Structures are given as structure tokens and as C-alpha cells.
From Swiss-Prot:
One of its GO terms (cellular component) is plasma membrane. This is Tyrosine-protein kinase receptor TYRO3. Its EC number is 2.7.10.1. Coiled coil: none annotated. SUPFAM superfamilies: Fibronectin type III, Immunoglobulin, Protein kinase-like (PK-like). One of its GO terms (biological process) is cell adhesion. Residues 29-414 are extracellular. Disulfide bonds join 50-103, 146-189. It is a single-pass type I membrane protein. The gene is tyro3. Pfam families: fn3, I-set, PK_Tyr_Ser-Thr.
Length: 881
């Protein structure tokens, strides 16, 4: 109970109530008194009351703007047995407390409503629109807008440019018109009213300029006629880079130069039609709306020698008793840059190569051959890269003086023909005998049935009650046609369908309520094995609609092609017994270093904690933002963006993964609201929590929470707040607090991602631009580049990422401990996610044994193995750090 007001107020109300009851002894149910207006200063206490008569022990409900007030600061005072006064106390009044209040009571189906009490909250001005960060061209006009509200009114706006006030006051809203600037400038505004002054955020206006020259120009995959050029763009000077120009200079004979324009990203291009065995030089420049950057430095490379694509022409042969003379049309040694060294002559007898001869002239003399047998000869042109296409076979008969060109394999041997005819005849005879025997076969009722049929009598009919097949249940063929999905989805998945015989399932990497992720070895076209991750739905909890939804999201992933978005390798179907739907599986790249959340967590609380530089964290943010920018450009809504769903690639770049699939696989961070599906509540935007609405703006909200996770190195957002309380917590105006050591610019960016109105949140394009600007300034200030080294030593396998990372960030040997020779372990009993790292998973030994077992069993596991998988979920997982 709280004190509802001064004793004099209570006494006066009691006296008024007593006087009313004395005037009329018969009291009808109803509220007495009149409504009134109340003005309260922000931060002070307000006390409201209403008086009800005509009911014993009433239930009086306070309402604000039609919504029941859930507050413990309410108190009842009885005047007599059927006359009561209710008090409502509002402590530390804020602007959301302003509104219309009244009381309601119900008795015998009749509702009574009091007059309204209007509460107005006065305080310092509140900004509804603040200046925003901009990037502008030099000396171009632009506007800045600032708006604030009271009460009390009126209020005025003052503008500041840097640390200097403009001195002119304007009413709200105020639009500041700037004719143009030439350098980076800060703008802010102040709002004044009778209660005080409020200051807006500081908006930074950057001046666009020419981009910096590209760097890290690299030449790879060089052949005789092609080469791949990749590069890193320089700082874009606050204007998006749209295209790059690659200049190629050839030093073949005379200097030849040509340029090639390509759109970006990706920052890579394949050069073709290059001269073989030639020195080339390459340089790159990139262009934004302000113009082109300076060129990068020249990078020199040599194309490889190309196999000649020429065939010897006009081959002639002269046969004598002791030798065979060959000659053909000569070829220029330097023709088309092939650097021809000579000719290779090969001869065969009875379909077996008898010898080879290399000559530099356009003639050859063969002496080592059997003149009693047919001889076939062919010739090719050769250089250091190899032998070109062979000429047609030249046939020299055993008694001919000169040959004529024909292919030796066109001769048809009579032996295979006879064998084929005999095989066909035997097959036809066997099939005829089988059908005849089957037609004459009768049951023990055959004679009786035959006589009845002859007389036109009734025929005995029966149906088998059950099958006594000893071979076990028949396996249903797993095809796209057998799972009941739409034709449109079939056509999308047809070219990425992988047969289940092409890969072998290994150990389980993670399990959840709706499915699991398993390691696997995929057999490639060149017979090599590639390690992949396989996601599959749990066998007993899905129907055909679940399969279609699962595979439809996989079809979306098929179209993705971006370095920061996890790309689909393929889909597969696991066969099951007839009558049961196949298990759908999605095949994804195996990310050696696991998910970003575990990496950040281990860097903070692992056995060897490391301090991640802010440049590295911002680089992670840029990677995620680039991936989300790409997804939003494809009109794809992620719905579950978080560090746990961002994977670390082998080169430590971040890839956005789990495109909506994770919402039905993992359940640890999800909350079921009523009977709806489980949701990642602490990452959801307000509109998603309230109306189940998902847009690119709700992904921006989740991106803000993801930034907070990265800055805090994997801490849980809204710690101490229950999932069921998140909506009330956010609607009350609360947000995640600024973490220690967090840049003000980063936290301002997070807060803008959490604006209540979705359309006022920044886009991923704008967020990426601002993050790149922050990273550019940090890179300039830093004395060293932000490189991330991962120690992949054999002691701990791929799992030595933490110790390697720890060493990489130490600048002096005297201040760094040497790498640990042993691996610590940390037992994690809860459900972990794909793929836990940094931490040692002992991939080498465990997988080899797992793969061998998989080879023996094949892909398909029998039904009893599903129970073993359930038991594995209960076991403790040991992660080596």
C-alpha cells in the first residue's frame, strides 16, 4: 500500500461521501463526482481517485485510454458498507502516462463508468525527428530537419554547426538549408520550452570524394589463354563503388593494351583471349559517382604455353620391303605462338601400340614393324605443353605399297556379332518358356473352377488378409515425384538434387526439437571427397507440407551467389519404408570455424581468452551487413538473423546462414507465443511480436541486436528479462544498453535499428556505408592491418583457432605466451549448434573412424538407428579448446 494523498484530502473526500449518503438513504449503483483535468510535471507523482456507491466490496477497475491499468499502486477506502473510494498513484510520471483515465465497476450485469480524468504531462521537449547522417557531394545544397514536441508549448529550435550556434531560433519542425560544404561537418539542434532544454543527436555529414586505388591485386588460375584477376576495393570515400576498369598490357611482339569494364561486386574478373606464353601486366581502377580512382600498381604475370590446336595435313606413306617412309605438310614453328618443337609419330598393330617416334622434321622412317600384319599410323604436333590433336589413322595393309586414310576401328569383327545374336536368341527362348509355364499353372481348385466357368456358375473370390513377406518392409523410392510437392518447386530443385549414394553421413553436429545437422562426406565428379554439412528434418514430425516448406527455402538458397551468404550445395532425399515419406536433406558447405556466437563466446570466456580488436569486430559487422544487403536486394526476408546463424569461413569471413530453416531446427533461443510457432523473441522487432509481421525492416531490427552481440563478445541480449516479458519491456521504451568500450557511433546505429516505426529504420545499404566509414577511419588510425590469423596446427587440428588467434593479435614476442601443446576441454551439456568452434573437435581421428563405419553401412540407416540418435542427444558433448 502507498499513501494515496495528504490526510486532509482523504478527510475531505470522506466528508463529502458521508454528506451524500445522509441526503439519500437509498443509494443507486453509480460513481459520484465529476471528471477533472490534471497537469503533472515529468518525474513527479500523480494521484487519481473515484468514488462508487451502491455496492458492497466492489471490484473497481482503472482504465487508461480503454486499456486496463496493471498497477499495484491502487487502494480502496470504505466510507460505509456500500460506499467506496478508489485511489490510483502514478509515480515518476513520464510522457507515456499522459491520457484519459476512468473507473469501471460491474454488478448484476450492469456496468457503471465514472467521469474521465485527463492527465497532461509537462516536461522538457521530446524529439520526434533528429538530424540524420548524410553523404553529400562537395558544394551541393542539402537540408537537415529537426522536430520536437511539448507540452508545455510553445518551443523553439536552435541549430548548431560543430561547436558554434547559428543564433537564429525557429519553430518546430525546423528545416536547416545548407548551401553546401567542402569538408566533414557536424550538425545538431536544441529544443527549448518553459521546462528546459533538450539536445538532439549529432549528425555527421560526410563529403563524397574519389575512391582510393584498389589494392591486393592478385592473379590466379593462369592457363595458356585465360587468367583470373581479383582485388580489394579501396576506401569508397562515402560513395558506393559501381564499376571497375581492368587494363591489360601484352608484351607479345609489340605492346598492346586494352581495357575491360566490369560491374562490382564481386571484385573479380576472368581475362580471356590472352596470347599463350606471353608476358602480361594488369592494373585496376574503380569508379563511384564522383569519378574514377587512381590505378593500382602494375601486376605482371606470364601465360602458360598452350597445347597446339593444329592437325598434321596431307600425310603420305611409301612402303618398301625394309622400311616405311612418311611425310606430311610442314608447319611454321612459331605459328600462332605455339612454339612447336616437333612431331610425334605413333603406330599400332592388332590394336596395340607398337612404338612412338619424335622427329623435328616433317618426315619419318619406320623400320621396327611386322610387315606381315596390318599397320595403322597417326601423327600429332607437339610442344613443351604437350601433344595436340592426332591425325586420322593411316592404314598400311600387309600387301599394299601405299595406304589410304581410314579409321581402323571401323572394321566390324564377326565374333562379337555372332555372340550378340546367340545371346538374344537364348533370352527370347527363356522368356517364352517362363510365360508358358506360368499360364499352365493351376491351384488345387483349378479343375473345379474350370468346370464352373464352363457351366457359367459363380466364381470364388477372396482377398489376402496379410502378407508373410520375410524380406522386410519394402523401401519407397525417394524422388521428387514421390513427396507430393508442386511442379514449380520440382523444376527449381531438379538440377541440385544429389543422389543419396553420393555421400556418407557422419557424426551428429547438432540436434534440436525439429531436426538435426550432421557431418558428411560428398563424392565429387572427380571422385574426390568433400566435407559438407547436412540438415535434415526429424523423421517422425513432418508431413508433405513441412517437406515442401523445407525444400522451398532450400530453393531460395539455390539462387544465392555472394561471398557473405552461405550457398546451397544441393538437396537430397533419404528413402524410408514404403508408405512413409522420404526424409528431406539440405546439403551446405562445412564451415570449419563454426558459428560466430561460439567464436565470440570462447574469445571472452574460453580457457585462453583473447582481446579481439575493434577493427575485427567491425569487419564481422560489415560482412553480415553485406550478406543481408544482398538478401534484401533479392526480396528475401531472413527472419532469424543472429550471431548463432552466422558462420565463420576458412578465411574468417562471415557468411549469413540458416535462411529461415533454423526456425524449425533449433529451439534454444525461441519462445512459443500461445499456439504459434517458436520464435527468436529477443531478436524480433516490435511489429513481429505484436502482429507476426516480417519485413526487411524487422531484419534491420535483428541486425541491431546482432551488432550488440558482436560488441559484447557473445553476451545474451536482455539478460534477466523473461521471453514472455520482452514485448512489455520494449513497448515501455526500453532498449539494450550501450556496452562498455562500444563506440558511440556503433551504439547510435543500433538504436536507429530499434526505432519503433519500421520505415524510419535505416536500410542495409546505409548501414553498410556507415560501417565501412567507421572501419576506414579505424584502419587509418591503426598502425597495423586488421588481419585474422588462425593456427591450424596438427596438435589440435582445426580447433586451434583460439590459440592461433591469440598469437596473431600479440604484437611483441615478449608479451605473448607460446602456443599451448595440449588442448583444454570444456564440457557442454546443453544443445550446441552447427558447428562449435573455436574449440578442438578432434576432426581427424573421429571422422576417419566415422567415415569408415559409414562406408560399411552406406548412407541409409535402418529404423532402429533412429533410437540411437535420440540417445546420442542426451550424451555430453566435449569440446576441446
Amino acid at each position: 500500500m502507498v499513501n494515496p494523498g495528504p490526510p486532509g484530502l482523504i478527510a475531505g473526500l470522506l466528508l463529502a461521501a458521508l454528506s451524500l449518503s445522509s441526503v439519500d438513504g437509498t443509494k443507486a449503483l453509480g460513481f459520484v463526482g465529476h471528471g477533472y483535468n490534471m497537469t503533472v510535471s515529468q518525474g513527479h507523482e500523480a494521484k487519481l481517485n473515484c468514488s462508487l456507491q451502491g455496492m458492497e466490496e466492489p471490484e473497481i477497475q482503472w482504465l487508461k485510454d480503454g486499456v486496463p491499468v496493471q498497477s499495484a499502486d491502487q487502494m480502496y477506502i470504505p466510507v460505509d458498507e456500500d460506499h467506496w473510494i478508489s485511489f490510483l498513484s502514478l509515480k515518476n510520471v513520464e510522457r507515456p502516462d499522459a491520457g484519459r483515465y476512468w473507473c469501471e465497476a460491474e454488478h448484476s450485469g450492469r456496468k457503471s463508468v465514472s467521469d474521465a480524468i485527463w492527465v497532461m504531462v509537462e516536461g522538457v521537449p521530446y524529439f520526434t525527428l533528429e538530424p540524420k547522417d548524410l553523404s553529400v557531394t562537395p558544394n551541393s545544397p542539402f537540408n537537415m530537419t529537426c522536430a520536437a514536441v511539448g507540452p508545455p508549448e510553445p518551443l523553439v529550435i536552435f541549430w548548431w554547426v560543430g561547436d558554434s550556434p547559428l543564433g537564429k531560433s525557429e519553430s518546430s519542425p525546423s528545416v536547416l538549408q545548407i548551401p553546401g560544404i567542402r569538408e566533414r561537418t557536424a550538425f545538431s539542434c536544441e529544443a527549448h520550452n518553459a521546462k528546459g532544454v533538450s539536445s538532439s543527436r549529432t549528425a555527421i555529414v560526410e563529403v563524397k570524394g574519389l575512391p582510393y586505388p584498389p589494392f591486393n591485386v592478385t592473379i590466379s588460375k593462369v592457363t595458356g589463354s585465360t587468367a583470373t584477376v581479383t582485388w580489394s576495393p579501396g576506401f569508397n570515400s562515402f560513395s558506393l563503388i559501381k564499376s571497375c576498369t581492368i587494363q591489360v598490357q601484352s608484351l607479345h611482339g609489340n605492346r598492346e593494351m586494352y581495357s575491360r569494364l566490369t560491374s562490382v561486386p564481386p571484385f573479380a574478373v576472368v581475362l580471356d583471349d590472352l596470347q599463350p606464353l606471353t608476358n602480361h601486366s594488369v592494373r585496376v581502377q574503380c569508379t563511384n559517382e564522383m569519378g574514377a580512382s587512381p590505378f593500382s600498381e602494375w601486376i605482371t604475370f606470364n601465360t602458360k604455353e598452350k597445347v597446339p590446336q593444329l592437325i598434321p595435313q596431307n600425310v603420305h606413306m611409301t612402303k618398301t620391303d625394309s622400311c616405311l617412309l612418311l611425310d606430311w605438310e610442314d608447319v611454321d614453328p612459331d605459328k600462332e605462338g605455339y612454339n612447336i618443337l616437333g612431331f610425334k609419330v605413333q603406330w599400332e598393330q592388332e590394336n596395340t601400340t607398337q612404338g612412338e617416334l619424335f622427329v623435328q622434321e616433317n618426315q619419318a622412317n619406320l623400320t621396327k614393324w611386322n610387315p606381315e600384319k596390318d599397320l595403322t599410323i597417326r601423327i600429332c604436333i607437339a610442344n613443351a605443353a604437350g601433344c595436340g590433336p592426332w591425325s586420322e589413322f593411316l592404314l598400311a595393309g600387309s600387301k599394299e605399297e601405299a595406304g589410304k586414310q581410314r579409321h581402323p576401328h571401323t572394321r566390324m569383327s564377326w565374333v562379337p556379332m555372332v555372340l550378340g545374336i546367340l545371346t538374344a536368341l537364348v533370352t527370347v527362348v527363356a522368356m517364352t518358356l517362363i510365360f508358358l509355364r506360368k499360364g499352365r499353372k493351376e491351384t488345387r481348385f483349378g479343375n473345379m473352377l474350370g468346370s464352373m466357368l464352363g457351366r457359367g456358375g459363380p466364381v470364388i473370390q477372396f482377398t489376402a488378409a496379410r502378407s508373410f513377406n520375410r524380406r522386410g518392409p519394402e523401401v519407397m523410392e525417394a524422388t521428387l515425384d514421390s513427396i507430393g510437392i508442386s511442379d514449380e518447386l520440382k523444376s527449381k530443385l531438379k538440377d541440385v538434387l544429389i543422389q543419396q549414394q553420393q555421400f556418407t553421413l557422419g557424426r551428429t553436429l547438432g540436434k534440436g526439437e525439429f531436426g538435426s545437422v550432421r557431418e558428411a562426406q560428398l563424392k565429387m565428379e572427380d571422385d574426390t571427397m568433400q566435407k559438407v554439412a547436412v540438415k535434415m528434418l526429424k523423421a517422425e514430425i513432418f508431413c508433405s507440407s513441412d517437406i515442401e516448406e523445407f525444400l522451398r527455402e532450400a530453393a531460395f538458397m539455390k539462387e544465392f551467389d555472394h561471398p557473405n551468404v552461405c550457398k546451397l550445395i544441393g538437396v537430397s532425399l533419404r528413402s524410408r519404408t514404403k508408405g512413409r515419406l522420404p526424409v528431406p536433406m539440405v546439403i551446405l558447405p562445412f564451415m570449419k570455424h563454426g558459428d560466430l556466437h561460439t567464436f565470440l563466446l570462447m574469445s571472452r570466456i574460453g580457457e585462453e581468452p583473447i582481446a579481439l580488436p575493434i577493427q575485427t569486430l567491425v569487419r564481422f559487422m560489415i560482412d553480415i551487413c553485406s550478406g543481408m544487403e544482398y538478401l534484401s536486394s533479392k526480396n528475401f526476408i531472413h527472419r532469424d538473423l543472429a550471431t548463432r546463424n552466422c558462420m565463420l569461413n576458412e578465411d574468417m569471413t562471415v557468411c549469413v546462414a540458416d535462411f529461415g530453416l533454423s526456425k524449425k531446427i533449433y529451439s534454444g533461443d525461441y519462445y512459443r507465443q500461445g499456439c504459434a510457432s517458436k520464435l527468436p523473441v529477443k531478436w524480433l522487432a516490435l511489429e513481429s511480436l505484436a502482429d507476426n509481421v516480417y519485413t526487411v525492416h524487422s531484419d534491420v531490427w535483428a541486425f541491431g541486436v546482432t551488432l550488440w552481440e558482436i560488441v559484447t563478445r557473445g553476451q545474451t541480449p536482455y539478460a534477466g528479462v523473461e521471453n514472455s516479458e520482452i514485448y512489455s519491456y520494449l513497448t515501455a521504451g526500453n532498449r539494450l544498453k550501450q556496452p562498455p568500450d562500444c563506440l558511440d557511433e556503433l551504439y547510435e546505429m543500433m538504436c536507429q535499428c530499434w526505432i519503433t516505426e519500421p520505415k524510419r529504420r535505416p536500410s542495409f545499404v546505409d548501414l553498410k556505408r556507415r560501417l565501412e566509414a567507421i572501419w576506414g577511419r579505424l584502419s587509418i588510425l591503426s598502425a597495423s592491418h586488421d588481419q585474422l590469423y588462425v593456427n591450424l596446427g596438427e596438435t589440435c587440428g582445426a580447433a586451434a583457432a583460439v590459440s592461433g588467434l591469440h598469437s596473431a593479435f600479440c604484437k611483441e614476442e615478449d608479451y605473448c605466451a607460446g602456443p599451448s601443446q595440449t588442448c583444454g576441454t570444456s564440457a557442454i551439456t546443453s544443445d550446441y549448434r552447427y558447428i562449435v568452434n573455436p574449440g578442438c573437435l578432434r576432426e581427424g581421428n573421429e571422422w576417419s573412424s566415422s567415415a569408415q563405419n559409414g562406408e560399411a553401412r552406406g548412407l541409409l540407416h535402418e529404423e532402429e538407428e533412429e533410437e540411437e540418435e535420440e540417445e546420442m542427444q542426451e550424451e555430453q558433448v566435449v569440446i576441446t579448446l
